[in-house]
Amino acid sequence: MKTILIAFISIAFINSTIILTENKKGEINGYFYELWYEDYNGKVKMSINENNFTCSWKNIDYVDFQYGKNIEPSKTLDELGNVTINYEAQINAEGDIMFGINGWAYMYESFNIIEYYNDEFVPPGTSLGTLFIDDGEYEIYYDEKPVQLNIHGINKAIIFSSVRKEKRLKGTINFNKHFQSWKKKGCKFEYISRLSLLIDGNKSKGNAIVNQIAINYKQK
């Protein structure tokens, strides 16, 4: 009887949908998920299944939905091999929103590959020129932001971004080509510690369906 009960509980967990309505993070089948937002007077919801999720938000100053992979320990691009991200989504939103890939290299070092955005979107930093990847033209941006460490000092966060000019909600991203292009523009990032698909809203409202997420790299 005990064996049957344990099997039943396991199946129920696998087939269930994880629903978030407050700041929270967790893991499902090797991927992490995270919901973070400001202004608790608004409403947010994130419903997560394996390799897909839906989300909605309104009356929120800032919201961040993520689904991706933590790479522990951090690895170089040579160690990861050919890194690709396959995705497909539908977004219906008003205001400043962006959709794409977010990642961390090391503490205070991050990067974005932005595939879709609304008219209110503000480019992230100073333009370093353009490049052609994945049958599309991207503009590269560099930005620095102060980070208050403690009362004794301030560090700076360094961010490199690729912003696709012809927006899309379905495709395959060749991460290596973006990373190598940032290097040519002065990027000194050495390690990759996190890769995620990101929906980011700033003073906006909307909903989204992410039908597919697959982050592929060599795992040892």
Task: Tell where the protein language model's regions lie, with residue ranges.
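Short, flexible beta-strand-to-coil junctions
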Residues: 14, 88-95, 104-107, 165, ...
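A structural detector for beta-sheet-dominated domains
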Residues: 21, 36-38, 45-49, 56-60, ...
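Long, compositionally biased interface segments
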Residues: 169-220
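Beta-sandwich interaction modules
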Residues: 68-76, 144-189
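An exposed acidic His-Trp-rich patch
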Residues: 106-168
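Beta-strand-rich luminal/extracellular ectodomains of secretory-pathway glycoproteins
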Residues: 17-80, 86
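Extracellular-facing segments of soluble proteins and assemblies that are Gly/Ser/Thr-biased and enriched
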Residues: 67-133
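Cleavable N-terminal signal peptides of Sec/SRP-targeted secreted and luminal proteins
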Residues: 2-16
